Swiss-Prot record:
Annotated transmembrane regions: none
Descriptive protein name: Large ribosomal subunit protein bL21
Native source organism of the sequence: Aliivibrio salmonicida (strain LFI1238)
Keyword terms: Ribonucleoprotein, Ribosomal protein, RNA-binding, rRNA-binding
Domain of life: Bacteria
Function of the protein: This protein binds to 23S rRNA in the presence of protein L20.
GO MF, one annotated term: structural constituent of ribosome
């Protein structure tokens, strides 16, 4: 059984027991989070696709940790001008473990 839900402007395909990183959520570590924006649920051969959401569909997850991703370097280089600009960015994330999918 798997589901596709939307969180942080992105769509995620998940199944029970899976761990994934989402955009930072404002919840405590160890808390339970319910995602109601379920776009599709597949249970064996039975597939339910929402228009746009599945009525009564819910994905439940437990927050494992919060953290920051790897550094991404941004470099702007102007050739022949003796000019260079460097910047770095680390995106905040929330790691969750999927505990249940219901339709």
């Amino acid at each position: 059984m798997y589901a596709v839900f939307q969180s942080g402007g992105k769509q995620h395909r998940v199944s029970e027991g899976q761990t994934l990183r989402l955009e930072k959520l404002d919840v405590e570590t160890g808390a339970t989070v319910d995602f109601d924006n379920v776009l599709m649920i597949a249970n064996g051969e039975e597939i339910t696709v929402g228009a746009p959401l599945v009525a009564g569909g819910k994905v439940t997850a437990e927050v494992v940790q919060h953290g920051r991703g790897d550094k991404v370097k941004i470099v702007k280089f102007r050739r022949r001008k003796h000019s260079r600009k460097q910047q770095g960015h680390r995106q905040w994330f929330t790691e969750v473990r999927i505990t249940g999918i219901s339709a």
